[in-house]
Amino acid sequence: MPLLTLTTDYGLRDPYVAMLRGRLLSRFPHWRTEDISHNISKYDLVEAVYVLKTAFPFFPPGTVHLLDVGYRSKNQENPWPSFIVVRYQGHWFALPDQGLLPLLVDRDESPLVQRYPLTVSRPNAGFALLDWLVAYRGLHAEPLQQCHYLQHNQAMVRHMM
């Protein structure tokens, strides 16, 4: 049974984690989901990646890790970012394409990365991952392409920190 983990800043007081889990169950009924954390500080992408990077090695290879933290792009034409799917150390990661990958992977490794745009015009109350999951045709459906994403985004990460 495939395993999927969730790391979000949704918190636990509102229905949002249940909404995400319901969407996942509807889309991937045979997958088991586990929570890494839903108490990431609001909008703290760096904290979210740190928590995920610390936890993922304890899960079996082949696990899919979803990371969704509140954010918006500065691009006025499309304020909702694309997501990237990354194959790294035997795990799969789906996270916003916000320059976070260099924080997740070691410098000497070249992960496989594929970018997927958010294809809905009005994301559901800011929960872009919910909408992206509905539009996405399957986590392993398309072959991932080798790229040099890590080197390309080093300057952006240094600027963030």
Go through the PLM ranges and name each one.
Residues M1-N39:
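N-terminal glycine-rich anion-binding loop in soluble enzyme alpha/beta folds
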Residues D9, G70, E142:
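Conserved acidic functional residues
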Residues G11, P15, D35, F58, ...:
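Residue-level preference for alpha-helix termini and adjacent loops
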Residues S121-M161:
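Anionic-ligand-binding alpha/beta catalytic cores of soluble enzymes and soluble regulatory domains
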